Amino acid sequence: MKTSNLIISLLVISPVTLSAQEQKIEGIVYDDNGNVVEFANVVQVDSCMHFVTGTTTSPKGTFSLPIQRKKNTGYLITSYVGMSSDTISLAKTFQQPLHIILKNKSTEIGEVVVKGKRSLFKNENDIITANVQNTILAKAGSLDNLMNQIPFVSGGGGEYNIFGRGGAVVYLNNSKVYDANILKTINSDRIKKVQVITNPGSRYSSDVKAVIKIFTVDNPDGLGGNAYTSITKGRKFSNNEGASVVYNSGKWQLTGGIGHANYKTQEYTEDRTSVISEPNLLYTNNTTLDYDMTFLDGNLGITYQPSARQTIGFNTRITKYEHNHTIDDAIINHYTDGVNDFHTDGVNKSKNVPIQWLTNTFYTLSLGKTRLDFTDDILVGTQSRKLFYGEQNDVEVSTKNKSHYLMNSFVADINTPITTKVSLNYGGEFTYSRYKQTFDFDENNIETEMKNAENKNEQILGAAYANLNTQIGKFSMNAGLRYEYASWQYFVGNMKQKSQSRDYNDLFPSLNISYHPNDVSNISLGYRQTVRRPNYGELNDNIEYQSRYYYVQGNSKLDYSYTNSINMLASYKNLRLIGSLDFVNDDIAMKRSLLGESKDIVLSQATNISNYKRWNVGVNWWQHFGIYTPYLEIGLGGQTFSYTYMDTPYHFNHPYVNFKVHNTFELKNDFSITLFVDYYGKNYSLFREVTEQWNTQLSLSKNIKSWFFELSVNNVLCPRSRTSTTRCDWINDASYSNRDNRNVFLLVSYSFNYKQKRHQANTKSNEIRRF
């Protein structure tokens, strides 16, 4: 009850006091192409042009300015660098909200156009901003190509990592992205800017390590859309296609889209699991793995903006996947002291079908200088997983795992400027989650250790937070504190398991201090504490059969893992430096051990492990040389982690080195060529060692009016092989893969008057990531 009162109190406190003599002017600022202009200056001056009061436009181009209404009220002046100012006499009457259009100064010079190289990246406090629109980055082609050209960002398929920080939560036009396939509909020429937040404040959930915000190009009213298709030829063909439309009319915006994909790959693998004992035991499994995934997605959204002060809307999205893994020619061998004492051919097939329905409703309101943002997310989903394993002599095992889940999350986010250099951000979250699963199996001519099971997880999460932002001279500071209460209950059947159920009361502080001595340099130091909560699929004790000598098990007693991070980000002109030091407590990993009294069956089980430290440091540099833009990045890192292997401490501390060499040639007629070379050195992740990896990409892209084409050749000269080795207890578990990483990729997209001017979707809960 105390927790609920605390959260409610923080939500209702909103200092909204207005002077009786003040009135407000509201409006939206556009450029002469119909794009909204953010951070434009809007000021009131008196008749002698003396400053009275002022503000800047929001990322949506809107402003709300309290003004002093007197007999001679002066003027309202709107300005932005590179654009002609707009002046309105406040003595006249006018209709609100104002629609102010600022003209680019270049349009006033007749046919003389001066084109310069715009800075690609800018550091501001703990944020790296990539200016994409009207720069060479707009010709990167696919979103993956673009993201891998942003300092310290890597990844693909809509999932991206920040060097030294880990996986980033991605937002598209302020809407959190839960399905990476959504990002495959976007090309670089549709993106306005990208922000990389390297030290998120307390307004973000405690399990968020980094944030990437992607903003698309804005346009005025009308109907527009985008359609795309792509094919990939590796060992097999894959295809991806979709379309989206948006209609803006005055105060209304309607959006919709549909997407479909079919990805197919083929990989050759060999697993070698050794039990180091007397006698020495070895299990090998050689396979040809065929992967086939089908994806279908549909979405619809409506936004209504009755005034510049408030917006209401909802978005709903349904996604369905079907994952099929097929191993038709598994060759299984067992050796005792080098003697092959068991051999069989096997078949392994798995099918995973998750379906999700996510609906987001949001409402934003400005009261005086205070902005209130309310969102509610409802997630309903099911998942069916089936596994069939067969050997010679009619040995068969089949398992079925079905899950149903529900989540409802309400988030309130409030921003109040206290002075021109001090602001307060505060709010809270209340989330209810339920995850129920059943597990059953059949076996023929073999006895396993599995059992039928039914279990359920329920969680109530309450959070309250506050962030104080202030600027003193060339210094700026963001200090925040987040309180989270989580009550988690675990049931077997309908019986609550008290030993596994538990409550958490946690405080998560954050701090970021930045120094900005001039326009070309910036340094930022920060601290943040984060938590890793186990996925609901891990929070059970079900034993699942993988093969005759290999089982996998969850763990209902998993605890939260906490990390304290010290982060640094600095820049000087086109040179950037990033660093971090993490103190990790009770991390979650898949530990290997023998199953029960068995001497040769290996169990891989989720568990909390001992504390350790991670460190990372990276440097990035880029520069324009005419049509050529090189981009160089190098990163170093490691961990201080030890674990028992063969009854002695084994140190997994070998440092790693990564580097990127990216080359872009910007040619005439909207034609560009890019050549990427990436290297990821041998590295450790806890007690798992992964060998080095090379990636290359040669891409050609071209815009022809509303059409965009990209042709890429990937990893042609790179080795396919990669090895992963886990050393734990008396077990050496190695996996060798011959990957399907060499391919040719073709993308074709068409945009017709594409518009999306409001970007109001505000899905915020991070609990969805646990399902």
Per-segment meaning from a language model:
Residues M407-V411, Q553-N555, D559, S565, ...:
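Outer membrane beta-barrel strand-and-loop segments of large Gram-negative receptors
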Residues Y30, V43-V45, S79-M83, Q95-I136, ...:
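Short, acidic, small-residue-rich periplasmic hinge/interaction motif at the N-terminus
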Residues Q149, K176-G201:
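Short acidic/polar hinge/loop motifs at secondary-structure boundaries
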Residues S350, A453-Q459, S499-R502, V531-N585, ...:
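Outer-membrane beta-barrel signature, preferentially recognizing the C-terminal barrel domain
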Residues T382, K436, Y485-Y490, Y515, ...:
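Surface-exposed extracellular loop regions of Gram-negative outer-membrane beta-barrel proteins
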Residues C48-T62:
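Short, acidic Ser/Thr/Gly-rich low-complexity loop/linker segments typical of extracellular
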Residues D297-H323, G346-V492, H516-D519, L575-G579, ...:
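Face-selective signature of the C-terminal outer-membrane beta-barrel domain
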Residues P97-I101, E111, L143-L146, A180-N181, ...:
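N-terminal periplasmic accessory domains that precede
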